[in-house]
Structures are given as structure tokens and as C-alpha cells.
């Protein structure tokens, strides 16, 4: 990094900078590396991965290995139809011996997406091979959509907004908060095949809003504007996830 930054005192200060934990405690780097969440970590990750991608690309070309590296921040995957003998060992050698990094072998794995039930989770998406059932060809194609981890995190946030502790809030306020959450989350998944997951999320959100209205029933009539919860939420403009970008709408 000092080869690229003219003010070396600034780079040294950045490496020594710590990271503040949620409880307010400052964590300082000890020995090698920087604390996760430190201000310099994303910059260092991009610098190292840039050179790794360059060096690994040259090594792959020399070994006749066709591959593509996809990276974001400090995370990356290497995609290939097959592996040349010794290429994976070469990748580890580049990272550890040439670049001085440590490969976390617990988080590093080789996946064969052609294997049954194999899946790759990357940047909130889950990639897996599924069989075609619509046209009856039986062929497998690459399916990708929201990961289960992302869906569970979203549902936890929806649960928090519709929790009993918020029962004194106006329905409009809760709907506005849930809508904002759904719009931001759904906007990230405008590619792929998220329709099945979207339907499940819509059902969960409607169920949570129905329970929220039930808890307020002692304070006013449970359903004011319709005979069903779906109709009631349509009146309040509850957001509904839909696959097509132009079709995502409020109920």
C-alpha cells in the first residue's frame, strides 16, 4: 500500500486505527492484520484482491486453467467448469506465500454445483442447479434468488416492527416502516428468480400485520375499511413484493 500512497504517515496511521464494537469498546489491531470493521480494512482488501486477481490470472493462463474471479469487498469466488491439476494449491500458494495472507480453510470450500442439493451463497444470493419442470425437459438450469439467511434477517426485522411493543403506534406508521424495509430489500433482488420467495415473504408480512391489528383490537375496531386483512392492508397501502420490476407495487 505504501507503494501507492505518497503520504506514508497516513497509511501507517490507517493500519493502526481500530474499530469500535457495538458496545462502544475500541478494538486495536494486535500483531498482523486489522480489526474486522476497521476503516482501512475495505481499502486493504481491494488492494490485495486486485493484485491477487492479476497474479492468479497469469498463473491460470500458464496452467491452461479457464476461470473467472468474482469479488466484492473482501469476499470472492473462483468459477470454473473444471480444475487443472494443482491449480487450487497454486491459488493458496499465491495468497499465503507470495502475498503473506492466511487462508481461512474453515470458510474456504470447493463446490460442484452439478451435485444434488449443492448451493453457493454469495452477496445475499443463493445459486443452485434445479430441474426444469415447466416444459418437462428434465434439464437442469442455474437458479438464483434471495438466500435463506437474507430472508430470515428480513423476517426478523418485520417481526420487530410489528412487535407488541409497537402496538400503540398508528397503523400508518408501522405500514410505512415495513414498506420502506420491503422496498429496499426487494430492490436488491430485481434479477434472478425470486418469485417463490417473494410469495412466502408477502404471506409472512400479511400474517404479521394481521396479528398486529388483532393486538390493537381492544383500542378500536379490528377491521375498519374491509372485510379481510388483505383488503384492510390494501387500504393502508402495504407494499407487496412481485418479481417483475414494473410489477412491484402496493396492495
List PLM regions with ranges:
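Non-catalytic terminal/accessory segments
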Residues: 1-251
Amino acid at each position: 500500500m505504501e507503494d501507492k500512497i505518497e503520504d506514508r504517515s497516513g497509511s501507517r496511521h490507517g493500519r493502526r486505527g481500530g474499530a469500535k464494537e457495538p458496545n462502544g469498546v475500541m478494538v486495536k489491531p494486535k500483531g498482523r492484520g486489522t480489526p474486522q470493521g476497521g476503516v482501512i480494512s475495505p481499502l486493504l482488501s481491494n488492494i490485495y484482491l486486485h493484485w491477487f486477481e492479476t497474479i492468479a490470472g497469469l498463473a491460470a493462463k500458464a496452467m491452461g486453467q479457464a476461470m473467472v474471479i468474482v469479488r466484492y469487498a473482501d469476499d470472492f469466488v473462483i468459477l470454473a467448469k473444471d480444475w487443472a491439476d494443482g491449480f487450487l494449491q497454486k491459488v493458496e500458494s499465491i495468497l499465503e506465500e507470495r502475498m503473506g495472507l492466511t487462508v481461512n480453510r474453515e470458510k474456504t470450500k470447493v463446490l460442484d454445483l452439478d451435485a444434488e442439493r449443492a448451493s453457493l451463497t454469495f452477496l445475499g444470493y443463493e445459486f443452485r442447479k434445479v430441474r426444469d419442470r415447466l416444459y418437462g425437459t428434465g434439464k437442469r438450469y442455474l437458479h438464483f434468488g434471495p438466500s435463506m439467511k437474507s430472508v430470515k434477517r428480513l423476517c426478523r426485522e418485520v417481526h420487530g416492527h410489528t412487535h407488541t411493543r409497537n402496538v400503540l403506534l398508528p397503523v400508518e406508521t408501522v405500514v410505512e416502516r415495513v414498506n420502506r424495509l420491503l422496498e429496499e430489500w426487494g430492490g436488491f433482488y430485481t434479477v434472478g428468480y425470486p418469485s417463490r420467495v417473494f410469495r412466502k415473504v408477502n404471506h409472512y408480512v400479511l400474517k404479521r400485520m394481521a396479528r398486529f391489528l388483532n393486538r390493537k383490537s381492544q383500542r378500536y375496531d379490528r377491521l375498519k375499511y374491509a372485510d379481510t386483512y388483505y383488503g384492510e392492508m390494501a387500504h393502508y397501502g402495504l407494499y407487496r413484493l412481485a418479481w417483475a420490476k414494473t410489477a412491484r407495487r402496493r396492495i
